């Protein structure tokens, strides 16, 4: 607040300082009365106020006219407060530095405000089963960060925070709805029981997209079986989970895995996969918003670092968004006669199994 008072006091004392503050905007000030006064000073300067060409000491009309002009747009501004602003300025020639202090505070506030909007949009989309609001708000935030970087004079580029992990890691994620968990179980059942189902989602769905870490581990097992070209069913899934120690460490029990596989309902892997992906996208958007807001609330963090760290925190959302686009643009899998027969397994699977069994 003192920086806002100082820069306004400098402009009231020396209108020439406004020429060094072209990069500063009225909405960078926190208080509405300061915004109105800065706008008024700039308007009087642009209109060629007589005080600017007067010889000798600056006429008092420069101050009174600025107060009168600003008073048309905001209440509470008096000539007495204008003189308070003048007294708050130690040195008029330091106005550009005071202005950068004002801009620094504005950058922190602006980033925080837009992350709140992103978080709200992500939560609303999660309830409605949509993603468009979160994606649109994320685009706005990216544009704001780029514009703030230009105003601050820094190159906008993603830079990871140097002090420890992401700010979002200490914040627990919001509780997941029963529908999300149900979608994940249905998807796993389809993938385990429907031949060729993994081909529909393997290109764009990742274990981290599952809200339940156990479901993510089971999907990782299915992905490993698919990658090695081995048959996929509830028995091989249990086998892979056992090999990975998921049963030994209590991540999942054989009864839980059987229950998941027996919960298969009509539907395609692509359809359930996109529902899981949609939930992952809104969850990631909310996590990015929380992380960036924590950065914006750190007063020690300079604007350049804040902007670049914020761009870095948007990286996970960009990655999920790219896979979401792939999921929605990929052609539907063609129906093929690739269902395993009751006879000999395909040679590739035999070779993979033997190679895997060889010491």
Label for each model-derived stretch:
Residues 323-329:
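N-terminal targeting/assembly segments of extracytoplasmic apparatus and virion spike/baseplate proteins
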Residues 113-159, 297-321:
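Non-catalytic interaction/clamp surfaces of large macromolecular machines
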Residues 122-125, 168-173, 223, 296-299:
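Charged, low-complexity surface segments at secondary-structure and domain boundaries
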Residues 1-106, 147-280, 335-359:
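Noncatalytic partner-interaction/assembly domains of nucleic-acid and motor enzyme complexes
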Residues 34, 38, 112-115, 219, ...:
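Generic structural concept
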Residues 96-97, 107-123, 281-297:
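Long, amphipathic alpha-helical coiled-coil/dimerization segments that form elongated scaffolds
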């Amino acid at each position: 607040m003192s920086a806002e008072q100082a820069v306004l006091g400098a402009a009231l004392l020396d209108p020439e300082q406004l020429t060094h503050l072209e990069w500063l905007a009225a909405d960078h000030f926190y208080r509405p009365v300061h915004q109105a006064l800065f706008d008024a000073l700039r308007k009087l300067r642009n209109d060629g106020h007589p005080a600017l060409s007067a010889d000798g000491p600056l006429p008092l009309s420069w101050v009174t006219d600025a107060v009168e002009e600003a008073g048309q747009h905001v209440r509470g501004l008096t000539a007495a407060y204008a003189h308070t602003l003048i007294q708050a300025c130690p040195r008029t020639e330091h106005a550009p530095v005071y202005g950068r202090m004002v801009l620094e505070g504005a950058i922190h506030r602006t980033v925080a405000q837009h992350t709140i909007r992103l978080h709200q949009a992500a939560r609303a989309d999660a309830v409605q089963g949509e993603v468009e609001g979160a994606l649109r708000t994320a685009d706005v935030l990216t544009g704001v960060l780029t514009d703030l970087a230009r105003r601050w004079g820094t190159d906008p580029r993603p830079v990871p925070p140097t002090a420890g992990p992401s700010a979002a890691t200490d914040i627990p994620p919001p509780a997941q709805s029963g529908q999300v968990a149900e979608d994940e179980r249905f998807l796993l059942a389809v993938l385990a029981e429907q031949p060729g189902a993994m081909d529909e989602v393997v290109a764009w769905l990742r274990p981290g997209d599952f809200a339940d870490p156990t479901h993510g581990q089971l999907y990782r097992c299915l992905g490993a079986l698919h990658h090695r070209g081995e048959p996929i069913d509830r028995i091989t899934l249990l086998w892979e989970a056992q090999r990975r120690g998921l049963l030994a460490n209590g991540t999942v029990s054989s009864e839980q895995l059987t229950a998941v596989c027996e919960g298969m309902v009509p539907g395609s892997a692509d359809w359930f996969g996109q529902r899981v992906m949609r939930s992952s996208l809104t969850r990631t958007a909310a996590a990015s918003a929380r992380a960036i807001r924590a950065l914006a609330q750190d007063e020690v963090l300079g604007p350049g670092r804040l902007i670049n760290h914020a761009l870095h925190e948007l990286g996970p959302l960009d990655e999920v968004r790219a896979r979401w686009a792939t999921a929605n643009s990929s052609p539907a899998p063609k129906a093929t006669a690739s269902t395993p027969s009751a006879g000999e397994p395909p040679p590739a699977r035999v070779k993979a199994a033997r190679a895997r069994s060889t010491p």
